[in-house]
A protein has these predicted regions:
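A cross-family phosphate/adenosyl-ligand binding-site feature
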Residues: 1-118, 124-213, 217-397
Length: 397
């Protein structure tokens, strides 16, 4: 996602500096050009050689390193950078930047940067809550630094409270959100549904399906990365929810119907990737249903058809995309669903096809519109999400 992007990773003198090494590695896996700048105090916690080995670039520490190229190094790097992040950021570095002090390689470079700048504080809770530190954070925010709030947890000083550097995965998501994609969906409101529904028959048992929500979550995440204002209405899943997205949890098909239809009128794009139950128990027992005999009959009734309702109430200019999971006659069944429910596009896949089932990290999809069908090869669900959004934006014009 970060191919061709240059990321400055500033590392300061904190016990959390070890996390920066993993972040550097994760950025390299995203194909970023990672330029690490350490303060002198940071070198007491991590050896610069570690970062040089992980990034393939020289780790900068000394502003007056004589082994420099002709360009004024901190200015040249600042001009080249697509994003700068200091993680961990000590109270000392934040105070310097808040007041415009430039006495080392990191501060001089950051003050020259015009790219997005992120600060991830890590320190003792009392230090973080100190009014002077908080004032400095406000100054940094007013000067277009984005502050990544620390987490609450057990700290190196044996205290417990705010001041813990977020996980590297969280820091990476902040970076990806800023520079991974062009913001071609900025200003659009997008509603995505994902995951299964659960239809209770008593306090213990329920009817559900094998959906994990991976495809819908990938779509919601890609919409967010491309600048959209995203609402994700999701059934219960075990996978991590995408960040920077408005999460609306539901359990039953009725709850999903209410949450989706209530929000639908204000959406520009609706992508319904959830696996919603078609039927639910006609009655729900207040007590656990006991075994009685060798057989049991469960009376079912139809659930609300969310996609049909959305198609019937689609506002002018709104784009409606559905999903179709089939085991046979995939194209015929999906075309019929597209027409019957007044969709702009339907994404079809076959459960029996290798790599396209529930719970996989890959998918094999066919995008069907009233005018054409586009079949794609096996790819990751993240890649498939990008292809789906590309097609939606093309069709919207």
């Amino acid at each position: 996602m970060l191919k061709g992007k240059t990321v400055i990773l500033g590392v300061t003198g904190s016990i959390a500096a070890y996390k920066a090494a993993n972040l550097a590695s994760m950025l390299k896996k995203q194909h970023a050009d990672v330029q690490v700048i350490m303060t002198q105090n940071a070198t007491q916690f991590m050896n610069p050689i570690t970062f040089e080995s992980l990034t393939g670039n020289k780790c900068l520490v000394d502003t007056f390193d004589r082994n420099f190229q002709f360009q004024v190094e901190h200015v040249a790097l600042a001009k080249r950078a697509d994003l700068a992040i200091i993680a961990p950021a000590t109270a000392n570095i934040m105070a310097k930047l808040a007041h415009g002090l430039a006495d080392d390689m990191l501060t001089t470079t950051l003050l020259a940067c015009r790219c997005p700048r992120l600060i991830a504080p890590a320190m003792n809770t009392r230090m973080f809550e100190n009014s002077i530190v908080q004032d400095n954070l406000k100054k940094l925010t007013l000067n277009d630094y984005q502050v990544i709030q620390p987490e609450v947890g057990f700290l190196a000083c044996r205290d417990e409270g705010a001041g813990k550097l977020p996980k590297e995965e969280v820091l990476l998501d902040y970076i990806l959100k800023e520079i991974a994609f062009e913001k071609d969906m900025k200003g659009l409101k997008v509603l995505v549904t994902a995951g299964p529904t659960m239809e209770a028959m008593d306090p213990v048992r329920y009817i559900t399906n094998h959906s994990t929500g991976k495809m819908g979550y990938a779509i919601a995440r890609n919409c967010m990365l491309r600048g959209a204002d995203v609402t994700l209405v999701t059934g219960q899943t075990s996978i991590e929810k995408p960040r920077f997205v408005n999460i609306v949890p539901i359990e039953s098909a009725r709850e999903m119907f209410e949450e989706v239809t209530g929000r639908a009128p204000e959406q520009d794009i609706i992508i319904k990737a959830a696996a919603v139950a078609d039927y639910r128990p006609q009655t729900v027992s207040d007590e656990k249903v006991k075994k009685s005999g060798d057989h049991m009959t469960l009376e079912l009734e139809k659930t609300d058809d969310i996609l049909k309702y959305l198609g019937e109430h689609k506002k002018e200019g709104q784009f409606l995309c559905g999903f179709s999971m089939e085991t046979e006659h995939m194209l015929e069944n999906s075309r019929a669903k597209l027409k019957k429910k007044n969709l702009d596009m339907i994404v079809a896949n076959n459960l029996k096809q290798a790599g396209a089932g529930f719970g996989t990290d890959t998918n094999v999809i066919t995008m069907i519109t009233p005018e054409e069908e586009i079949s794609l090869d096996l790819m990751s669900k993240e890649e498939a999400a990008g292809k789906i959004l590309d097609e939606i934006l093309k069709l919207r014009g």
